[in-house]
Amino acid sequence: MARRYFGTDGIRGQSNVFPMTPDLAMRVGIAVGTIFRRGHHRHRVVIGKDTRLSGYMLENALVAGFTAAGLDVFLLGPIPTPAVAMLTRSLRADIGVMISASHNPFSDNGIKLFGPDGYKLSDELELEIEDLLDKDIYAQLAKPAEIGRAKRVDGDIYRYIEFVKRTLPRDVTLSGLRIAIDCANGAAYKVAPAALWELGAEVVTIGNEPNGININLECGSTHPEALQKKLHEVRADIGIALDGDADRVIIVDERGEIVDGDQLMAVIADSWAADNTLRGGGIVATVMSNLGLERFLGDKGLTLARTKVGDRYVVEHMRNHNFNVGGEQSGHIVLSDYGTTGDGLVAALQVLAKVKRSGLTVSEVCRKFEPVPQLLKNVRISGGKPLENPIVLQAIADAESALANNGRLVIRPSGTEPLIRVMAEGDDSAKVEKIVNDLVGVISSARSAA
């Protein structure tokens, strides 16, 4: 069944443009509240958000919907996505909501939903919500005496800070480390520097002055250049770049080099395997992860299980097959011993623990493998189905034949933006570049002809 509202990470779009309108947000509140209004106890929902200007609008619309459906609402304010997942469980809420478009610009926003167990909702539940959204939603409203209440909750941000601190092994402190952190002017602008400082680090912070429109603006995990500059300026030992809702992380080593999610997963998997705490015999990643990671793990006797793109699918595979490390090249790192979704700060602490215990530099710890040449380009689309065009299909088949057994090709529509992503990797960088450029040209032509 086709999905009408939900993408790979909730509902997302440009603010005040369908589907990111106050009307739909209120309807989502009613629909979700109706589905989770089970049993005779008083039902509750927790709502967090990042620092986007439109967060105020969507927050109030969701509150109207949930209270109209008979749920009490706890408003957490600006707080990371993994904190919402954690507090949904901790506060025994029926549902958790994060208002965020993650790494997207401020003009976008989104609604992510978590079940009472702290995990993102299944495809089946999202389809059930979509079905309700297209019906007479107002027939589901609570009786007058059962309308919910809403209140702002103070102090839960500190509960999350304490949770994060407990994920660092007790025999490790961060004393002696100078850490530069970029909070992307987003949800972690308070919690991340506080947690690192309380663990003993000297902390230099950028991207911690949100104004509603500067989230992810030339900062954060998708724009690490500002962090690289600051790291050199203050001679930090490590740089940590979070995204707008802090569920992904990118590291910058002491030389100013980028360490992506694939390398971070390699570090954690290698460390946990040595400690006999790695489960599943390997890790879970998506089709976008580098072939070099797969080869590195294979040399260690570990496996790489691949899923389609989206951390929710990584988590689903982890749960079904008893893995405890998974993630994405983009920096979503899921460590199920600690949480139910990607947590940039928790992942960074695992790397810092390895650095402190080994006495090595960040570059020595984090350069686990040589990435296979990989190139990713995006083709923006406004409609049509260029991937069903016969000429495009033939070009894809030719590209796969050219790579043969020496590389991989991944072509997929983005689940969060109107893009088609074209990725190829292989040992021959010139061949990879030609394949990607040729395919981008063919898809662009098919798009124009549609």
UniProtKB/Swiss-Prot annotation:
Q: Tell me how the cofactor is bound.
A: Binds 1 Mg(2+) ion per subunit.
Q: What is this protein called?
A: Phosphoglucosamine mutase
Q: In which residues is Mg(2+) bound?
A: S102, D243, D245, D247
What organism is listed for this UniProt entry?
Agrobacterium fabrum (strain C58 / ATCC 33970) (Agrobacterium tumefaciens (strain C58))
Gene for this chain = glmM
Read off the Gene3D superfamilies from this record: Alpha-D-Glucose-1,6-Bisphosphate, subunit A, domain 3, Alpha-D-phosphohexomutase, C-terminal domain
SUPFAM superfamilies in the record: Phosphoglucomutase, C-terminal domain, Phosphoglucomutase, first 3 domains
Q: What is its EC number?
A: 5.4.2.10
User: According to its UniProt record, what is one Pfam family this protein matches?
Assistant: PGM_PMM_II
Task: Kindly provide the PTM information from the record.
Answer: Activated by phosphorylation.
As its record notes, the protein acts as a catalyst of: alpha-D-glucosamine 1-phosphate = D-glucosamine 6-phosphate
Residues of the active site are S102 (phosphoserine intermediate)
Q: Give an example GO molecular function.
A: phosphoglucosamine mutase activity
Cofactor names from the entry are: Mg(2+)
The record's section on InterPro entries has: A-D-PHexomutase_a/b/a-I, A-D-PHexomutase_a/b/a-I/II/III, A-D-PHexomutase_a/b/a-II, A-D-PHexomutase_a/b/a-III, A-D-PHexomutase_C, A-D-PHexomutase_C_sf, A-D-PHexomutase_CS, Alpha-D-phosphohexomutase_SF
The Phosphoserine modification is found at S102
Per its UniProt record, what NCBIfam families does this chain match?
Answer: glmM, PRK10887.1
HAMAP family listed in its UniProt record: GlmM_B
